[in-house]
């Protein structure tokens, strides 16, 4: 509901103004100024390995030999025979690697996880280590409770030790398992980090590993950047940024997508985290990737840029200096609505900056802004009116006049009939702000007559009776202050009262 107070979290990555507004108006604007996501997070949180026979470490002959029941598996893993350990673990892996409804709880309830963790330490038997890591990977891909069962039995440290295995298939499977564990929650992420996983992951990147392995590492690094309450420690961030910068120069789309997601998670943490990211010199590459034809790349990249320009004025200027505004103009014309929404949200954050940044925005994007108000879908228009209120409440008189007469009024007044009440509230705030703060009397009269010309007066008059109290109060306030002649000489003449 537009009238409710906005939770603090909703504003964390959305800059807005309102210093000169009354507190109730600030609250109404604050409740609407957030990124309305058009989709769920598109990065995969956890991954389950369902390719039964991908490993060259396992012969097809052995596949035919595996006919274990769960009781057979339990008996075999508790034996002293390494061959039975391998065959039973492999059978368990096959059991939970089916595509639909894998029986993860059967393995957990059978008490197999402690044995599987022990098998991770079986250095003379890399095939057994591989199978055990695979089973734990798939269990950790399940619910948080299932992931906790893996962590509780001490799997993290031996998995990290396997990152140094001379067998790439073993170390890659360990990376995968750690990615699933880290992606579950901040607690498990920090457990992985505190056990010194990051340096081992970085070492693997420099070894010329296969592209599939590198994809797993980039995804695992992104999960180490993921989750909040708390965000990852700044020391961990400083460790991860050099390899992330290196991966951002890669040409593989999956690696680029996961790396951009990692950076979007970090920059969501506030100005300190943004500082660590922008001081790497990575902004020009991020600006370049804003126009990627791959949505899997452009979406997290736009999230990252939008988060950065929600930071300090200096951080925003660094993005502008990297050419972000010119590229943003291209992205705002993207045929996909979800991309336009992200780009318009980014634009609104720039609009909350100081006047010289507002000037740069107006020079680069004002015609596009007007066009979006006229022709875009409502969810895009919503971000654009947030941009307009941010521009207006920080603008100079010249900028305010330019904005008022740029062509925004007609499409903006049309939005007073929008079904989204937050949009209606923001548009009313914009109209009120323009009428109150344009100082030049002729410009103010010009604004008034334009509002009447485009049917704004009638729309605002009708909104006095709206069921939403914030809308009706705002509309009444505008009518009483600016469209009624009350004898004090301050209001402009309303319709039928002109002389």
From Swiss-Prot:
Domain of life: Eukaryota
ARM repeats: 101-141, 144-183, 186-226, 229-268, 271-310, 313-352, 354-393, 397-436
A GO MF term: nuclear import signal receptor activity
Localization per record: Nucleus
Keywords: Nucleus, Protein transport, Repeat, Transport
One Gene Ontology CC term in the entry: female germ cell nucleus
SMART domains in the record: ARM
Knockout or disruption consequences: Mutant mice exhibit abnormal preimplantation development. About half of the mutant embryos fail to develop into the blastocyst stage, or are delayed. Lethality is greater among female than among male embryos.
Pfam families the UniProt entry points to: Arm (PF00514), Arm_3 (PF16186), IBB (PF01749)
Coiled-coil region list: none
Domain IBB: 1-57
Tissue: Expressed predominantly in ovary. Isoform 1 is the predominant form.
SUPFAM superfamilies from the UniProt entry: ARM repeat
A biological process from GO: protein import into nucleus
PANTHER family the record matches: IMPORTIN ALPHA
Subunit organization: Binds to importin subunit beta-1/KPNB1 via the IBB domain; this complex dissociates in the presence of RAN-GTP. Shows a limited binding to the RB1 nuclear localization signal (NLS), but not to the SV40, nor NPM1 NLSs. Interacts with RSL1D1.
Family listed: Belongs to the importin alpha family.
Role according to the record: Functions in nuclear protein import.
Annotated protein name in UniProt: Importin subunit alpha-8
Protein source organism: Mus musculus
């Amino acid at each position: 509901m537009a009238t409710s107070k906005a939770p603090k979290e909703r504003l964390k990555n959305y800059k807005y103004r309102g210093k000169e507004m009354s507190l109730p108006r600030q609250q109404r604007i604050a409740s609407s100024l957030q990124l309305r996501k058009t989709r769920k997070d598109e990065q995969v949180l956890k991954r389950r390995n369902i390719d039964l026979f991908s490993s060259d470490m396992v012969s097809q002959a052995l596949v035919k030999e595996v006919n274990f029941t769960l009781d057979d598996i339990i008996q075999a893993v508790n034996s002293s025979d390494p061959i039975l350990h391998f065959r039973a673990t492999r059978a368990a892996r096959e059991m939970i690697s089916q595509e639909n409804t894998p029986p993860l709880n059967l393995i957990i309830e059978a008490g197999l996880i402690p044995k599987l963790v022990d098998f991770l330490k079986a250095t003379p038997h890399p095939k057994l280590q591989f199978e055990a890591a695979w089973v734990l990977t798939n269990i950790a891909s399940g619910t948080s409770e299932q992931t906790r069962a893996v962590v509780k039995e001490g799997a993290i440290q031996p998995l990290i030790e396997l990152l140094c295995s001379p067998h790439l298939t073993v170390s890659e499977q360990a990376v995968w398992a750690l990615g699933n564990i880290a992606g579950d929650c901040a607690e498990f992420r920090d457990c992985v980090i505190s056990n010194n996983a990051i340096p081992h992951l970085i070492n693997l990147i420099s070894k010329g590993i296969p592209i599939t392995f590198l994809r797993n590492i980039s995804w695992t690094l992104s999960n180490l950047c993921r989750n909040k309450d708390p965000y990852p420690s700044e020391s961990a961030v400083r460790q991860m940024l050099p390899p992330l910068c290196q991966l951002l120069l890669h040409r593989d789309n999956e690696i680029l997508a996961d790396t951009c997601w990692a950076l979007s998670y970090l920059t969501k943490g506030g100005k300190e985290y943004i500082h660590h990211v922008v001081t790497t010199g990575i902004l020009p590459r991020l600006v370049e990737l804003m126009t990627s034809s791959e949505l899997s790349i452009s979406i997290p990249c736009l999230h990252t840029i939008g988060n950065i320009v929600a930071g300090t004025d200096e951080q925003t200027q660094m993005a502008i200096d990297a050419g972000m505004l010119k590229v943003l103009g291209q992205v705002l014309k993207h045929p996909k609505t979800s991309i336009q929404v992200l780009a318009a949200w980014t634009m609104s954050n720039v609009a909350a900056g100081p006047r010289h940044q507002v000037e740069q925005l107006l020079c680069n994007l004002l015609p596009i802004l007007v066009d979006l108000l006229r022709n875009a879908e409502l969810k895009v228009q919503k971000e654009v009116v947030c941009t307009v209120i941010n521009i207006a409440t920080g603008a100079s008189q010249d900028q305010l006049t330019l904005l008022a007469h740029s062509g925004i009024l007609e499409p903006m007044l049309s939005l007073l009939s929008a079904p989204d009440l937050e949009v209606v509230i923001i548009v009313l705030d914009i109209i009120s702000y323009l009428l109150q703060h344009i100082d030049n009397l002729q410009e103010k009269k010009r604004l008034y007559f334009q509002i009447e010309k485009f049917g704004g007066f009638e729309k605002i008059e009708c909104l006095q009776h709206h069921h939403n109290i914030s809308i009706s109060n705002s509309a009444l306030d505008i009518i009483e202050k600016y469209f009624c002649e009350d004898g004090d000489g301050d209001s402009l003449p309303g319709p039928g009262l002109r002389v």
